[in-house]
Amino acid sequence: MRRGSVLPAWGALATVLLRARALLAQAETAPTPAAEAQPFDWEWLKGQARELARQPFTPLGEDRPPQLQALTWDQYNAIRFRPDHALWVGTDLAFQIQFFHLGIFYRHAVQIYQVDDGQARRIAYDPAMFDYGPNKFDPPLPPDLGFAGFRVHFHEDFRQDVAVFEGASYFRATDRDSQYGMSCRGLAVDTGLSRPEEFPVFTRFWLVRPRPSDTVLTVYALLEGESATGAYRFGVAPGGITVMDVDALVIARKPIERIGLAPLTSMYQFGENDPIPDSSTTVGPGPSPWTSRWRR
């Protein structure tokens, strides 16, 4: 992933532009809000982020109905996306998209759009997309529930993940051996201070329908938080090592004491031994294919 730098500048609204450059600027007038089959491009999304920065922050509500709030980890994991319902399945495109269900600690629904020929249309949640396993919901789940996020699959093996966008502003990717690297966040705010850190959230995504010859998937995202808003553009290029090229415009709503751009995160079990991050350890028989991976 490419990281940018922050250059100090005057103004109450700080605008950070990643991909080897950054600047601070005041918010500008934005285009009208998104609607069904509305024209979409990068400039429009940046305008949305600027307009949101001019408005008071509205905390995100609880999108999980009680039935999903009560799920255990095993019950939630029993909810599986049906691959035959993937976005772009049955086409000659190199990518497919599968969606994640709300539940357990995924409490905020994200809006996901497909962009085709510059027109954005929202992808509707449909319970038929999912196999709920032994789970039975009474009353039935709402028909407009929404998604928790999505994962990207590539034509070399549609069964394997390439990248995942799910939870707050988290995203991550795999290599050709399906080993996930460290997770990344779109933005970190006030980490390591005496007060709790702030977690800005990707609330909307736009997936650009690729051409049959495309081997890079373009994903856009809108970030919302109490202290900042942002517009993000991801170029996801699968391969031996998956490469993500990221452009981001981040606008501060108020002064931020500590800001982290493209922060990397991992985890390890605390104990007497030296910490071994779960994102970088693999176990295999040598040069032959991997047989197992230590995750946690």
Residue ranges of each PLM-predicted region?
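Solvent-exposed N-terminal domain segments of exported/luminal and surface proteins
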Residues: 53-193
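C-terminal segment of N-terminal export signals and the immediately downstream linker at the start
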Residues: 17-58
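Low-complexity, acidic Ser/Thr/Pro/Gly-rich terminal tails and inter-domain linkers that flank the onset
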Residues: 225-233
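Short, solvent-exposed loop/turn and secondary-structure capping segments
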Residues: 124-126, 232, 258-262
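Beta-strand/loop-rich accessory regions of lumenal/periplasmic or secreted enzymes
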Residues: 134-214, 222-225, 247-296
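Short, solvent-exposed beta-strand/turn "edge" segments of beta-rich domains on protein surfaces
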Residues: 101-103, 235-241
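N-terminal export signals
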Residues: 1-25
